[in-house]
Amino acid sequence: MQIGLDFNLVEDLVAGVDEVGRGPLCGAVVTAAVILDPARPILGLNDSKKLTEARREALFDEICEKALSFCIARAEVEEIDSLNILQATMLAMQRAVEGLHITPKLALIDGNRCPKLAVPAAPVVKGDSQVPAIAAASILAKVTRDREMSAFELIYPGYGIGGHKGYPTPVHLEALARLGPTPIHRRSFAPVRAAWEVREGVTDSLI
């Protein structure tokens, strides 16, 4: 039995939903919805941020194998910029729940608000540390997004994306100012917008 997680909430057809990637300056926001199988418990579930990368990777495979149903979804950079990050996150969560091949009786959403869903839903603050299905969803979402950021490191070298995963670290902000935004940067985010405006200003001065 794991301290901190309420295993009474591992019930038939309860989906846990979480997101990763609201704060970064680049890349998609990734969500996951997971319905765990009470007959096939997964040991070691916890908030993905509290686990090592190796442990997350191992749990990712175990969750995919043992869950009754799971779906990983996303909202792309273009959607984030057109909708705003909150609405894009809600859309991505909605896609994750709708993508489950089993309809849950209840969706438990990490955080303090719920997307519009066709099934009953409830928010759970710090749910990734309390509800096993939300913890599982956080692991699927984080591993998926981290893998994407590692791939972008090869496509857009010089930004350190593989290390900071797109978050606004000093290394990232310095590279953004020096190299300018890439196509995967969120132009609606202030540091990216500022770097883009500087870039456009330089271009205009050369015309």
Curated annotation (Swiss-Prot):
One of its GO terms (cellular component) is ribonuclease H2 complex. Its EC number is 3.1.26.4. Its cofactor is Mn(2+); Mg(2+). Belongs to the RNase HII family. Pfam families: RNase_HII (PF01351). This is Ribonuclease HII. InterPro entries: RNase_HII, RNase_HII/HIII, RNase_HII/HIII_dom, RNaseH-like_sf, RNaseH_sf. Residues 12-201 form the RNase H type-2 domain. It catalyses: Endonucleolytic cleavage to 5'-phosphomonoester. It is found in: Cytoplasm. Endonuclease that specifically degrades the RNA of RNA-DNA hybrids. One of its GO terms (biological process) is DNA replication, removal of RNA primer. Keywords: Cytoplasm, Endonuclease, Hydrolase, Manganese, Metal-binding, Nuclease. GO terms for molecular function: manganese ion binding; RNA binding; RNA-DNA hybrid ribonuclease activity. Its main location: cytoplasm. It comes from Pseudomonas putida (strain ATCC 700007 / DSM 6899 / JCM 31910 / BCRC 17059 / LMG 24140 / F1). It comes from the Bacteria. The keyword Manganese applies. A divalent metal cation binds at residues 18-19, 110. The gene is rnhB. The keyword Manganese applies.
